[in-house]
Amino acid sequence: MKNYRTYTYLSFLNIIFFMTPFTSAHSLEDAINSQDRSPKNVARDQYRNPYKTLSFFEIKQDMKIVELSPGSGWYTEILANYIHSPGMLTAAHFDKNSDRDFYIRMRNNFEKKINENPMYKNVSIVDLSSKLADRETLDAVLTFRNLH
């Protein structure tokens, strides 16, 4: 009888496991508090209030988002940990072929950051001047701290 109960229990768990949609366990708080974030960026949380900001914009894990001019990727660190399939995160950065050294340096540093950490495996990068996406396919376009 004991083996019957064990098999029944394991079968039940197996059904639950395979019928449950695969979603991230990460909440927005988990993404903000992730160990993957740089300590330098975490130190600025108290001033930038990422939880309040992203909650205000009603950003959800399954959204398709374009982040305009992500700079060095402060918000990208959080969004990359939070946005999961079927959602997507596209970073629209300075053009690779710009004639401005600053733009090229910023883009190269951002690409290096994205390519060196598996946390960013689902982040795509496009040129800011290119067609970012069809309007109908996006849930949000975000821009932070770059309009002065």
What is the predicted role of each segment?
Residues 61-71:
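Conserved class I S-adenosyl-L-methionine
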Residues 103-130:
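S-adenosyl-L-methionine
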Residues 142-146:
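A conserved beta-strand element that flanks and buttresses the S-adenosyl-L-methionine
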Residues 10-20:
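Bacterial N-terminal signal peptides
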Residues 73-77:
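Glycine-rich SAM-binding Motif I of class I
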